[in-house]
A protein has these predicted regions:
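Catalytic phosphate/metal-binding cores of nucleic-acid and nucleotide-processing enzymes, i.e., regions
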Residues: 1-98
Length: 98
């Protein structure tokens, strides 16, 4: 029997993959405001906000509203709920840097 993947497992994997790729990754938190995405990835002119979820889980309504506001302001916000999702994001970022 395999252990169920948790949000923290996906977050740890994202951190490791970003470090391997040479990206800056930071934990994020709004001051005096809720629903900030979990992580911010910065690399070569690209900035991506990342909301992490356990497999199959979806963002709460307040998070969805905040993501929509951020996207209207021209920000990229990705929601990731799997290790494969992390791999896909890293591959996209590497492709956009070329």
């Amino acid at each position: 029997m395999t252990a169920k993947l948790r949000e923290s497992d996906i977050e740890g994997y994202l951190i490791n993959q970003c470090k391997k790729a040479g990206y800056l990754i930071r934990k994020t938190q709004w001051v005096g405001h809720n629903h900030c995405p979990d992580r911010l990835i910065m690399t070569a002119g690209l900035t991506v906000w990342v909301e992490l979820k356990a497999p199959g889980k979806k963002p709460r309504s307040g998070q969805l509203r905040e993501h929509a506001r951020m996207r209207l302001a021209g920000q990229r916000v990705d929601v990731i709920d799997s290790l494969a999702g992390v791999d896909q994001l890293i591959a996209e970022l590497q492709g956009e840097q070329k």
